[in-house]
From Swiss-Prot:
<feature type="site" description="Interaction with DNA">
    <location>
        <position position="487"/>
    </location>
</feature>
<feature type="region of interest" description="Disordered">
    <location>
        <begin position="1"/>
        <end position="23"/>
    </location>
</feature>
<dbReference type="GO" id="GO:0005737">
    <property type="term" value="C:cytoplasm"/>
</dbReference>
<comment type="function">
    <text>A type II topoisomerase that negatively supercoils closed circular double-stranded (ds) DNA in an ATP-dependent manner to modulate DNA topology and maintain chromosomes in an underwound state. Negative supercoiling favors strand separation, and DNA replication, transcription, recombination and repair, all of which involve strand separation. Also able to catalyze the interconversion of other topological isomers of dsDNA rings, including catenanes and knotted rings. Type II topoisomerases break and join 2 DNA strands simultaneously in an ATP-dependent manner.</text>
</comment>
<dbReference type="GO" id="GO:0005524">
    <property type="term" value="F:ATP binding"/>
</dbReference>
<feature type="binding site">
    <location>
        <position position="535"/>
    </location>
    <ligand>
        <name>Mg(2+) 1</name>
    </ligand>
</feature>
<keyword id="KW-0799">Topoisomerase</keyword>
<feature type="domain" description="Toprim">
    <location>
        <begin position="456"/>
        <end position="570"/>
    </location>
</feature>
<comment type="subunit">
    <text>Heterotetramer, composed of two GyrA and two GyrB chains. In the heterotetramer, GyrA contains the active site tyrosine that forms a transient covalent intermediate with DNA, while GyrB binds cofactors and catalyzes ATP hydrolysis.</text>
</comment>
<dbReference type="InterPro" id="IPR013759">
    <property type="entry name" value="Topo_IIA_B_C"/>
</dbReference>
<dbReference type="InterPro" id="IPR006171">
    <property type="entry name" value="TOPRIM_dom"/>
</dbReference>
<dbReference type="Pfam" id="PF00986">
    <property type="entry name" value="DNA_gyraseB_C"/>
</dbReference>
<dbReference type="Pfam" id="PF02518">
    <property type="entry name" value="HATPase_c"/>
</dbReference>
<keyword id="KW-0963">Cytoplasm</keyword>
<dbReference type="InterPro" id="IPR036890">
    <property type="entry name" value="HATPase_C_sf"/>
</dbReference>
<keyword id="KW-0547">Nucleotide-binding</keyword>
<feature type="binding site">
    <location>
        <position position="537"/>
    </location>
    <ligand>
        <name>Mg(2+) 2</name>
    </ligand>
</feature>
C-alpha cells in the first residue's frame, strides 16, 4: 500500500531505525580531512561524471544523499527539496545539522571545512556515520565548487547559523543567530552556467530519484517542490494518485522496499504468490545490514535491482552474487525434496529460477568497497557471506511454511527450463564476425567494410524500401544496414524460446554478435553504435518501442553503456527552389522555416511542401543528408539513468495491463512528443 505523508516530522535525534547502523558522536572532532579541494572547477567530470544534464542533476543528488545519511543514522525522517524560481535548488533535512564547532586541525568552523575541503566529512575515520552514500564523501565541497553561489543555514547547538559562499569560497565568517530547539541543515546552491551545458532541472528526473530514495528508506518523507513557472515545471511522476500537473510531490513508504516490489509488480499481471517475501538481518559488529524483498509474477523476464548505502549498483556485486547463489540452491533443493525434479533432470539454472522474479536487494555497509569512482559494483566479500546465509535460511523457511506457493514457483522455473532447452540451438547465434560472414547470417544484412567495432555503426531500418535507400545512401566503409521485415515480436509477452525463434530477433542477435541474457558478452559487440531508424510517425515509434523492449530485456548492457541511438528523420521537405531545400523535423520547425522564408520575401507553393509518410519516400541522397551523415543527422542516445523506472515503463507500454497503459496515455497526452499530427 503506497502512502503519501506530508506531516511535519518530529525531532528524532538519538533514535535508531531498525536496520540502520549509526554512531553516536557527530561534532567538529568527527570531521576528518583527507585532501584539499583542488581543480574541481577545471576537471568537473572527474567528480560528477559529466557537465551535461546528468552531472547537473548529480549535484542535487549529492546534497540529498548527505541528508539521507542522516536518515540512515536514525536521526532524520524528512527531506524537502525545492527548485527555486531563479534556478537555484534548496535541500533541507531535519537531521542533526552540519557541525559548526571549531575544527581542531583546520582552526575554522567544521561546516566551512566540509564545504571547502575535498574529502572532508563525517564519512571518514569512523566519525559521525556508520554508513553513508554520496560520491566518496566529496559531495558537499564539489557542489560548492561547481556553484556560483551557495548558502548554508544550520540549526544545531541550540542556535541558527548561516554562511554564504561564492565560487566555492566563503564571503563572510559563520554567523550565529537566534536560539532555537530545531535541528537540521538547509543548503541552497546555484549551479555555474559557465561549467554546465544546461542549468535547467527536470522535475521528472528529480521526482523519480526521490521516489526511489523513499522506497529504500522506509518511513522517510521526501518532498519535491518546483517554484518555476508552470510552463517549465512538468511533474510526470509515475504514481496513479499523483497529479501530473502538480508542482509538489511527496513520497513516503512505510513498507520500504516491500512497497518497492509491490510498485514494480503492479504492472506485471497477477503475482505468483500474494505476499512479498521479506528478509532482513543486521551485523552490528561489522556495521552491516541487509534488506531483501522479492515476489514472482507471471512475466518472463526478471527485475532484480541492488543497492548499497542507497546507491544503485547497476553492475551488481557481492550482494547480488550472494542472493543469486542462495536462491538457486534453495529452489533446487526444494524441487528435489518435493520430487518436482526427477533424478535424471539437470538442476534448474539461476536464469530459470529468476524468470518473473522482482527483487530489491538493499545493503548498508560501514566500509563499502566500490569498483570505480561511480559506485556501480560492490566488492565487499563479507556482504556475499551474509546474503548467502540469510537468504538460504529465510527463503527455505518460507518455502516450508508456504508449500502451495513454493510449488507454483518451482513449476514456473521448470517450465522456464523446458523453454531454455528448446531455445538452446537459437542461443548458438552468438558468433564472431569471421564466422558470421560464412554462416547463415540474414542475407538482408549489408555489412560494412571496417573490422573495427569502435568506428562501425549499424542502422536497424524498418521495411525493405527504406532499407534499399539506406543501403544506397550509406558510407559502406563503416555503416552497416539491417532491414527489419515482418512482425516484430513483443518480447514483454513471450518466453525466451519464442523470443529466440523469432526471425527478426535472430537477425539482430546474429548481427550484433553479443548473445543474450546470461550468454551476453559485450566484448563481442560488432558495432559500437546501434541506430534504430524508423518512420517519424506513431507506427514508427511503436516499432522503435518494440525494438527497445527487446534490447532492454535481453541485451541491457547495450543500453547501459550508451551504444543504442534513435535516428530522427525529417517530417517535412520544404523546396523553395531547385537549389534551396530545407528539412523540418517537427510541425513547429516547419512553421518557423516557412515564416522566416516569407519574411525574407521567398514564395512557395503548397505542393513544394512534402510531408514524408515514411523513410521509403526519401531517395538515397535525401536519407543520407538528413538521417545518416554524421555531419548533418540528428541522433538521440538512449540512456538508462533509472533501470527500475524503465522496467516499469516497458511493463506499462508493452505488458498485459490495458488499464495502466490507458492511464499512462491520458497522463501524457498533453506532451506533444506523443502526438502524431
Amino acid at each position: 500500500m503506497t502512502t503519501y505523508d506530508t506531516r511535519t516530522a518530529t525531532d528524532t535525534r538519538g533514535s535508531e531505525q531498525p536496520g540502520h547502523v549509526g554512531t553516536a558522536s557527530y561534532d567538529a572532532n568527527a570531521i576528518t580531512v583527507l585532501d584539499g579541494l583542488d581543480a574541481v572547477r577545471k576537471r568537473p567530470g572527474m567528480y560528477i561524471g559529466s557537465t551535461g544534464e546528468r552531472g547537473l542533476h548529480h549535484l542535487v543528488q549529492e546534497l540529498v544523499d548527505n541528508s539521507v545519511d542522516e536518515a540512515l543514522a536514525g536521526v532524520a525522517d524528512r527531506i524537502d527539496v525545492t527548485v527555486l524560481a531563479d534556478g537555484g535548488v534548496r535541500v533541507v533535512d531535519n537531521g542533526r545539522g552540519i557541525p559548526v564547532g571549531m575544527h581542531p586541525v583546520e582552526k575554522r568552523p567544521a561546516v566551512e571545512v566540509v564545504l571547502t575541503v575535498l574529502h572532508a566529512g563525517g564519512k571518514f575515520g569512523g566519525g559521525g556515520y556508520g554508513v553513508s552514500g554520496g560520491l566518496h564523501g566529496v559531495g558537499l565541497s564539489v557542489v560548492n565548487a561547481l556553484s556560483t553561489r551557495l548558502s548554508a543555514e544550520i540549526w544545531t547547538d541550540g542556535h541558527r547559523w548561516t554562511q554564504d559562499y561564492r565560487d566555492g569560497a566563503p564571503t563572510a565568517p559563520l554567523a550565529r543567530h537566534e536560539a532555537t530547539s530545531r535541528t537540521g541543515t538547509s543548503l541552497t546552491f546555484w549551479a555555474d552556467g559557465d561549467i554546465f551545458e544546461t542549468t535547467e532541472y527536470s522535475f521528472e528526473t528529480l521526482a523519480r530519484r526521490h521516489q526511489e530514495m523513499a522506497f529504500l528508506n522506509g518511513g522517510l518523507t521526501l518532498t519535491l517542490t518546483d517554484e518555476r513557472s508552470s510552463a517549465r515545471a512538468t511533474a510526470a511522476v509515475d504514481e496513479a494518485d499523483s497529479d501530473p500537473t502538480a508542482k509538489t510531490v511527496s513520497y513516503r513508504y512505510d513498507g520500504g522496499i516491500t512497497d518497492f516490489v509491490v510498485h514494480l509488480n503492479a504492472r506485471k499481471g497477477e503475482p505468483a504468490h500474494p505476499s512479498v517475501i521479506t528478509i532482513a538481518a543486521e551485523d552490528t559488529e561489522r556495521l552491516l545490514s541487509a534488506e531483501i524483498a522479492l515476489q514472482w509474477n507471471g512475466q518472463y523476464t526478471d527485475s532484480v535491482y541492488s543497492y548499497a548505502n542507497a546507491i544503485h549498483t547497476h553492475e551488481g556485486g557481492t550482494h547480488e552474487e550472494g542472493f543469486r547463489t542462495a536462491l538457486t540452491t534453495v529452489v533446487n533443493r526444494y524441487a528435489r525434496e518435493k520430487r518436482l525434479l526427477r533424478d535424471k533432470d539437470a538442476n534448474l539454472s539461476g536464469e530459470d529460477i529468476r524468470e518473473g522474479l522482482t527483487a530489491i536487494i538493499s545493503v548498508n555497509v560501514g566500509e563499502p568497497q566500490f569498483e570505480g569512482q561511480t559506485k556501480t559494483k560492490l566488492g565487499n566479500t563479507e556482504v556475499r557471506t551474509l546474503l548467502q546465509k540469510i537468504v538460504h535460511e529465510h527463503l527455505a523457511d518460507w518455502f516450508d511454511r508456504n508449500p502451495n506457493e513454493a510449488v507454483d514457483i518451482v513449476r514456473k522455473a521448470v517450465q522456464a527450463a523446458t523453454a531454455r532447452v528448446a531455445a538452446r540451438k537459437a542461443r548458438d547465434l552468438t558468433r564472431r564476425k569471421g564466422l558470421l560472414e560464412t554462416a547463415a547470417l540474414p542475407g538482408k544484412l549489408s555489412d560494412c567494410q571496417s573490422n573495427d567495432p569502435a568506428t562501425s555503426e549499424i542502422f536497424i531500418v524498418e521495411g525493405d524500401s527504406a532499407g534499399g535507400s539506406a543501403k544506397a545512401g550509406r558510407n559502406p566503409q563503416y555503416q552497416a544496414i539491417l532491414p527489419i521485415r515482418g512482425k516484430i515480436l513483443n518480447v514483454e509477452k513471450a518466453r525466451i524460446d519464442k523470443v529466440l525463434q523469432n526471425q527478426e530477433n535472430q537477425a539482430l542477435i546474429s548481427a550484433f554478435g553479443t548473445g543474450v541474457h546470461e550468454d551476453f558478452d559485450i566484448a563481442k559487440l560488432r558495432y559500437h553504435k546501434i541506430i534504430l531508424m524508423a518512420d517519424a510517425d506513431v507506427d514508427g515509434q511503436h516499432i522503435s518501442t518494440l525494438l527497445l523492449t527487446f534490447l532492454f530485456r535481453f541485451m541491457r548492457p547495450l543500453v547501459e553503456e550508451g551504444h543504442v541511438h534513435l535516428s530522427r528523420p525529417p517530417l517535412y521537405k520544404i523546396k523553395w527552389s531547385r537549389e534551396h531545400v530545407e528539412y523540418a523535423y517537427s510541425d513547429r520547425e516547419r512553421n518557423t522555416l516557412l515564416e522566416r522564408g516569407r519574411r525574407d520575401g521567398r514564395r512557395i507553393r503548397d505542393d513544394s511542401i512534402q510531408r514524408f509518410k515514411g523513410l521509403g519516400e526519401m531517395n538515397a541522397e535525401e536519407l543520407r543528408v538528413t538521417t545518416m551523415d554524421p555531419d548533418h543527422r540528428v541522433l538521440g542516445q538512449v540512456t538508462l539513468d533509472d533501470a527500475a523506472f524503465a522496467d516499469d515503463l516497458f511493463s506499462v507500454l508493452m505488458g498485459e495491463d490495458v488499464e495502466a497503459r490507458r492511464h499512462f496515455i491520458q497522463r501524457n497526452a498533453q506532451d506533444v512528443r506523443f502526438l502524431d499530427i
